[in-house]
Swiss-Prot record:
Residues 230-497 form the CoA carboxyltransferase N-terminal domain. Gene3D superfamilies: 2-enoyl-CoA Hydratase, Chain A, domain 1. NCBIfam families: accD. Zn(2+) binds at residues 232, 237, 253, 256. Keywords: ATP-binding, Chloroplast, Fatty acid biosynthesis, Fatty acid metabolism, Lipid biosynthesis, Lipid metabolism, Metal-binding, Nucleotide-binding, Plastid, Transferase, Zinc, Zinc-finger. It is an enzyme of class 2 (transferase). One of its GO terms (molecular function) is carboxyl- or carbamoyltransferase activity. This is Acetyl-coenzyme A carboxylase carboxyl transferase subunit beta, chloroplastic. Pathway: Lipid metabolism; malonyl-CoA biosynthesis; malonyl-CoA from acetyl-CoA: step 1/1. Belongs to the AccD/PCCB family. The lineage of its organism: Eukaryota, Viridiplantae, Streptophyta, Embryophyta, Tracheophyta. One of its GO terms (biological process) is malonyl-CoA biosynthetic process. Residues 30-50 are annotated as: Disordered. PANTHER family: ACETYL-COENZYME A CARBOXYLASE CARBOXYL TRANSFERASE SUBUNIT BETA, CHLOROPLASTIC.
Length: 497
């Protein structure tokens, strides 16, 4: 005997009842049985008097004597939703919240009998005696089809709301209080149960047979797909790109050609010859020099979080490599590490890289991607601007060596005001956001509206702020030509590509 379950919920006073509906293999509607285990002889006698659903008068006459709302906690371990999708196909979904198992049933003959049963009940004399009109919260929809949400969203919402009810049940319901007119289970089934708790969603993974489904909880829908898909950041696109193919295409959107943010490791791989990367000062980590006070979390805890998230020790990677066989010193900032903010360690690593390039007569390339100086280190982070600029003065003016700065999106604040704009050649990526102060800060300070696009690379290029705008595809070749133009050549002439 296969069983399918449904909730019969009547929001009249304190009446709540769950019954089970047995379905035989020949799709005939069997007797209605009470699933409650109760030793009350009066109630057991009542249950024995319930006959087949075809004997509707006998069944309906006994409904209002079945179960009090105080026993509701005994009935909410499983549930079934009757759903109709956008194609008008009907489904019954049963789930056991303890085992987190779902069963999907689209047996049309059985569902037709269920539908007939509920509609006949809805039109019965019991319902027409004023109960529906007197109870403002009564609402039962056999097939709840929310036009504002998709099929999956509605199922997720119902499941989410139901599981929330397993954790936190209104105390007035548990205590049998008279203030129980707002039938929370009825609201949940009818799609009125409110928002999901803490933004959590539930995903249904279907087995091959299409009947059994398993519930899986995740903190966010995006978490399920972030390792597979990347959304374009362009406000005119927002296209979705497959992550594996995106890496091979240099993080350039397939739909609109927008240059997405890149991890520092990916950019290093893009910029230099394979197998030539030699990192420097990897063991340098940030402390808390000013014991920064924060209501949210400690500065050290934030550093630890981003170290685990990115696998980096700081917001920049510095080292040496070869550019088509030409030895270079290169530093690449990573915006994923605290917004690429420049603190004491970032400033020290850049300064040491410049000094190494000065002593070894190497061309220098710095890739900027930063929100500016790190506020958690106060004036110590601002001091890095002067320290780096001083080292660059010796490198450029005294040693007459060649420095290229590459501005990617975003480059703002103290980085823009220091080494970002000190390159002998300043290269910008297409559509890069380049500014000293952000748009919102300027508007709040000057009480003026900033035109759209006034801080984009293309607009600033026409104002003479930097030299070329170079896409990522030819960037390595352009850098190689610039370096050779300034007198730096490959160690092995055969390595020129």
């Amino acid at each position: 005997m296969e069983k399918s379950w449904f909730n019969l919920i009547l929001s009249k006073g304190e009446l709540e009842y769950r019954c089970g509906l047995s379905k035989s293999m020949d799709s005939r509607l069997g007797p209605v049985e009470n699933t409650t285990v109760n030793e009350d002889p009066t109630r057991n006698d009542t249950d024995k008097n319930i006959h087949d659903c075809s004997d509707s008068s006998s069944y309906y006459s006994k409904v209002d004597h079945l179960v009090d709302v105080k026993d509701i906690r005994n009935f909410i371990s499983d549930d079934t939703f009757l759903i109709r999708d956008s194609n008008q196909d009907r489904y019954s979904i049963y789930f056991d919240s303890e085992n987190q198992i779902f069963e999907l049933n689209n047996d049309h003959s059985f569902l037709s009998e269920l539908e007939s049963f509920f509609y006949s009940y809805h039109n019965s004399s019991y319902m027409n005696n004023g109960s529906k009109n007197d109870e403002p919260h009564y609402h039962f929809n056999l097939y709840d089809n929310d036009t504002n949400c998709g099929w999956n969203n509605h199922i997720n919402s119902c499941i989410d709301s139901y599981l929330r009810s397993q954790i936190c049940i209104d105390s007035s319901i548990l205590s049998g209080s008279d203030n129980s007119n707002d039938n929370y289970i009825s609201n949940y089934i009818c799609g009125e149960g409110g928002n999901s708790s803490e933004g959590k969603n539930f995903d249904i993974i279907t087995r091959e047979n299409g009947n059994d489904l398993t519930l899986k909880e995740s903190s966010n829908d995006l978490d399920l797909y972030k390792d597979l898909w990347v959304q374009c950041e362009c406000e005119n696109c927002y296209g979705v790109n497959y992550k594996k193919s995106l890496n091979s295409k240099m993080n350039i959107c397939e739909q609109c050609g927008y240059h997405l943010k890149m991890r520092s490791s990916d950019r290093i791989e893009l910029s230099i010859d394979p197998g030539t990367w030699g990192p420097m000062d990897e063991d340098m980590i940030s402390l808390d020099p000013i014991e920064f006070q924060s209501e949210e979390e400690l500065y050290k805890d934030r550093i630890d979080f981003y170290q685990r998230k990115t696998g980096l020790t700081e917001a920049i990677q510095t080292g040496t490599g070869q550019l088509n066989g030409i030895p270079i010193a290169i530093g690449v900032m990573d915006f994923q590490f605290m917004g690429g903010s420049m603190g004491s360690v970032v400033g020290e690593k850049i300064t040491r890289l410049i000094e190494y390039a000065t002593n070894n007569f190497l061309p220098l390339i710095l890739v900027c991607a930063s929100g500016g100086a790190r506020m958690q280190e106060g004036s110590l982070s601002l001091m890095q601007m002067a320290k780096i600029s001083s080292a660059l003065y010796d490198y450029q003016s005294n040693k007459k060596l060649f420095y290229v700065s590459i501005l990617t999106s975003p480059t703002t604040g103290g980085v823009t005001a220091s080494f970002g704009m000190l390159g002998d050649i300043i290269i910008a990526e297409p559509n890069a956001y380049i500014a000293f102060a952000g748009k919102r800060v300027i508007e709040q300070t000057l009480n003026k509206t900033i035109p759209e696009g006034s801080q984009a690379a293309e607009y600033l290029f026409h104002k003479g702020l930097f030299d070329p705008i170079v896409p990522r595809n030819p960037l390595k070749g352009v850098l190689s030509e610039l370096v050779q133009l300034h007198g730096f050549f490959p160690l092995n002439q055969n390595s020129i590509k």
